[in-house]
């Protein structure tokens, strides 16, 4: 199990950042270089002001050649299941890659807190990834470690980097004048 954590502070009020990321993710995704699209599959209101969202992400990432036979372009993406707690400004999430199903577990939380005297937001994105390639029989031998290392690198480097870009996109949407 490998853990990752990143903290970002942005110059927008925490409630506006939280709501933009929760409610406008497909718009924000259009601003991300590594993301082709985000499509909402499910949105359910939960008890106590919570919200459950399921999104399908499609990525456009250059992959190492070692993954060519394992990851086809049409499976380069993931399902994101998120439970948003509006009272605590917290999101618990789980990512299920479309490639190597059942062999990669990635989950974590995103916490939104007021910063800069209420004029900004401090966002903590943290999680863990567990890869069990050889245990499922799909990949065995020396390739197992290579693929595990590449997938770990993508999740622990690309995902947090894209989260920073997601926050930047949310701030850009907040700053845009409304078209009403």
Segments and roles (model prediction):
Residues 17-21, 125, 170:
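Hydrophobic pocket/interface hotspot
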Residues 1-4, 8, 40-45, 98, ...:
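Soluble, non-transmembrane catalytic domains of enzymes that act on hydrophobic metabolites at membranes
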Residues 140-180:
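A conserved amphipathic terminal alpha-helix motif
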Residues 25-28, 32, 82, 166, ...:
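Hydrophobic, Leu/Ile/Phe/Ala-enriched alpha-helical segments that form helix-helix packing faces
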Residues 48, 87, 117-119:
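Short strand-connecting beta-turns/loops that link adjacent beta-strands
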Residues 53-54, 78, 83, 92-153:
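Beta-strand/loop substructures that line and gate deep hydrophobic ligand-binding cavities in soluble
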Residues 62-86:
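Helix-adjacent hinge/juxtasegments
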Residues 1-66, 72:
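Hydrophobic ligand-binding cavity/cleft-lining segments
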């Amino acid at each position: 199990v490998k853990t990752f954590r990143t903290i970002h502070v942005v110059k927008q009020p925490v409630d506006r950042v939280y709501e933009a990321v929760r409610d406008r993710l497909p718009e924000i995704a259009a601003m991300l270089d590594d993301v082709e699209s985000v499509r909402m599959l499910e949105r359910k209101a939960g008890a106590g002001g919570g919200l459950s969202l399921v999104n399908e992400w499609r990525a456009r990432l250059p992959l190492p050649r070692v993954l060519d036979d394992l990851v086809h372009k049409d499976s380069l993406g993931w399902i994101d299941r998120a439970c948003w707690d509006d009272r605590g400004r917290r999101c618990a999430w789980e990512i299920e890659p479309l490639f190597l199903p059942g062999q990669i577990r990635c989950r974590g939380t995103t916490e939104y807190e007021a910063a800069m005297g209420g004029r900004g937001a401090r966002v903590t994105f943290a999680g863990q990834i567990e890869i069990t390639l050889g245990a499922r029989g799909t990949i065995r031998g020396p390739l197992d470690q290579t693929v595990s290392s590449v997938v770990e690198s993508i999740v622990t480097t690309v995902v947090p980097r894209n989260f920073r870009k997601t926050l930047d996109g949310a701030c850009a949407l907040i700053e845009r004048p409304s078209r009403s």
